[in-house]
């Protein structure tokens, strides 16, 4: 497989696994190599964890590394193992440069959750979602309730994304990109939506 441009999250000091047995310091031009056997699991010393898109890195952070104040690095590496579309592993990874971290709003996290759940959702839920996305079904009380529940919904969405990532028609990068726009759901899933 050819070398790919990938993305890695570190803590605010450019480190991963702070204080652990796999503690690593990253920076521009730094390469690390996995020490475990190549047949080991992705989340182990056998593979160095990376992402194929910066938005996926940020959206998956709470259920993966859960780094506080993360930094985002562009990287180079050869993908040798995948967890669906959620993350990938390289035997060697080189961080190239520090990038601006995408800032994801609560509403964008909810849109990501919607995009992940849409393919398997009921028609009544899809109708409600179409109205929510268009702004038709957002009273002040609903907005307050949504804000209170949004973080939990986003966490559930990330878990749902993990479960659906192996589904053949699922494009996690397209969903993440769509979530940061105000485009209607039909641009992501071109099917008729009846509001």
Annotate each PLM feature.
Residues 1-195:
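Short, glycine-biased loop/turn motifs at secondary-structure junctions and
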